[in-house]
Amino acid sequence: MRRVTVLGATGSIGRSTLDVMARHPDRYELYAATAHSNLNELFSICIKHRPRYAILATDAGLAGFKKRLRDAGVSTEVRVGVEAMCEASSASDVDVVVAAIVGAAGLVPTLAAVNSGKRILLANKEALVMTGRLFMDAVRRHGAELLPIDSEHNAIYQCLPEAGQHLSDMTSLAAYGVTRVLLTASGGPFRHFSQQQLQQVTPEQACRHPNWSMGRKISVDSASLMNKGLELIEACWLFDLTPGSVQVHLHPESIIHSMVEYVDGSILAQMGNPDMRTPIAYGLAWPERIDAGVQPLDLFSIGKLHFEMPDKERFPCLRLAEEAFSLGGTAPAVVNAANEVAVEAFLQGDIRFVDIPVVIEKSLLKGSIVDADSVETVIEADRVARQYASEAINELAGGVVVP
C-alpha cells in the first residue's frame, strides 16, 4: 500500500489522480489532500477518501469546514498553510507526492517533497521552470524519484529507453541515441484566428479547450501557447536538453502526446486519448501498468492526424519562453510570474488576450535578471516580476475596452 499526498487535490489533475487511486484501493491510500479555496470539493474528497490530513491554503472558512467534517463523522485532521503542506509532502509515512498545485504557489511544498527523497509525480511545471538547475540538483542530491505527469513530458519519458528514464542521472540523452524531442501542442481554440480576431477573444472562449478538460489558467496558457513555452523549458531541465533539440509541433487532434527521434532515423511516439488519467496512472504505478479508466484509442474513427508549425508572430508567448530560457538565471521565473498576473487580469476582464504577451515582455525587459543561485533569489524575482506586471496592466487597462 502506497500512501499519497496530493498537492492541489481539488483541481483537474488532483481529481483525476483520486479517480485513478479509487480504482485501486488495494494499492493506494490518500494521506493528505490540499486545496486553495474549493472547500466544497475538499469536503467531498474527505468524505470519499478519508485522508489523514486536509490542508487549506488559508484559514478562510476554516471553522465552518471543520464543523462540516465533525457533523459528517469524518476524523480527518484539518491544517492550514504552506508549512503544513510541506510537512505533508515530507512526512516519513508518505511514499508518493502528486505536485498538482497550479503556478508558483506549488514551488515550496514540491521542493519539500524533493528534499525528502519522495517519488514525485510532477504536474506543477512552474516549480521546475522557476528553479531549473536548483530543482534538478536537489532531485539528484536527495535521491528523489521524479516522474513527469504532464502528458507531453510523460510521453517523452515513455519513449526513452529504461536507462534514460533515471532523471537523477547526469547522462545526456544523446548517449542513448536521442537526437531530438518533438513536443506536441493542440494549438488551442484560436489556432487559425487572425490577429484581428485574437484582439476580440473573450475569457470564455479561451477557456473552452477543444480537446482537454483543464482549469481556467492552464486553458488560457494553452490558447496563448505559453503553456507550450513553459513545457519547452520544463523538457530542457527534465531531460537535459537545449531548446534547439526540442521542436514544437501543433497537432490539433491531441492524440500523439510527444515523440522522441533517434540517431538511426526512428521516431517513437506515445499515443492515446487526451485524458490525464493515463500519465497519472503511469506515474503512480511505474514501472508497472495499471488500469486508468481511459477508453482505448480507436484509430479507425480518427482517420487522420495533422501537424503544423507554430506561428510565433501571432502567438509570441512561445518565443518569450524560449528567450527566457536562453537568458537563463531568473528570467524564466520572471516570465512565469508575469504570465500568471497577466492571465488573471485577462480572466477578470482588465486586459485583452493579445495584451498577455505585452505584459510579459514589459516585465522581462524591466526586470534585472540575476543568477538563480537560491530559492530565495527566485522567489524575490517572482515577487518583483509580479509588481512589474501589475504596473504594465495598469498602463494597458487605462485605454482598453475589453470585449
UniProtKB/Swiss-Prot annotation:
Residues noted as binding Mn(2+) in the record, renumbered to the chain: D150, E152, E231
Involved pathway(s): Isoprenoid biosynthesis; isopentenyl diphosphate biosynthesis via DXP pathway; isopentenyl diphosphate from 1-deoxy-D-xylulose 5-phosphate: step 1/6
UniProt entry keywords in alphabetical sequence: Isoprene biosynthesis, Manganese, Metal-binding, NADP, Oxidoreductase
SUPFAM superfamilies membership: 1-deoxy-D-xylulose-5-phosphate reductoisomerase, C-terminal domain, Glyceraldehyde-3-phosphate dehydrogenase-like, C-terminal domain, NAD(P)-binding Rossmann-fold domains
A GO biological process held by the record: isopentenyl diphosphate biosynthetic process, methylerythritol 4-phosphate pathway involved in terpenoid biosynthetic process
Residue sites binding NADPH per the record: T10, G11, S12, I13, N38, N124, E126, G215
Cofactor(s) this protein cannot do without: Mg(2+); Mn(2+)
TM region(s), chain numbering: none
Residues that, per the record, bind 1-deoxy-D-xylulose 5-phosphate: K125, S151, E152, S186, H209, S222, N227, K228, E231
Superkingdom of this protein's organism: Bacteria
Coiled-coil ranges (or none): none
Enzyme class, broadest EC rank: oxidoreductase
GO MF annotation list: 1-deoxy-D-xylulose-5-phosphate reductoisomerase activity; manganese ion binding; NADPH binding
InterPro entries registered for this protein in UniProt: DXP_reductoisomerase (IPR003821), DXP_reductoisomerase_C (IPR013644), DXP_reductoisomerase_N (IPR013512), DXPR_C (IPR026877), DXPR_C_sf (IPR036169), NAD(P)-bd_dom_sf (IPR036291)
Keyword Oxidoreductase among record annotations: yes
Catalytic activity: 2-C-methyl-D-erythritol 4-phosphate + NADP(+) = 1-deoxy-D-xylulose 5-phosphate + NADPH + H(+)
EC code: 1.1.1.267
Similarity annotation: Belongs to the DXR family.
Job of this protein: Catalyzes the NADPH-dependent rearrangement and reduction of 1-deoxy-D-xylulose-5-phosphate (DXP) to 2-C-methyl-D-erythritol 4-phosphate (MEP).
UniProt name for this protein: 1-deoxy-D-xylulose 5-phosphate reductoisomerase
Top-level taxonomy: Bacteria, Pseudomonadati, Pseudomonadota, Gammaproteobacteria, Oceanospirillales
Gene field: dxr
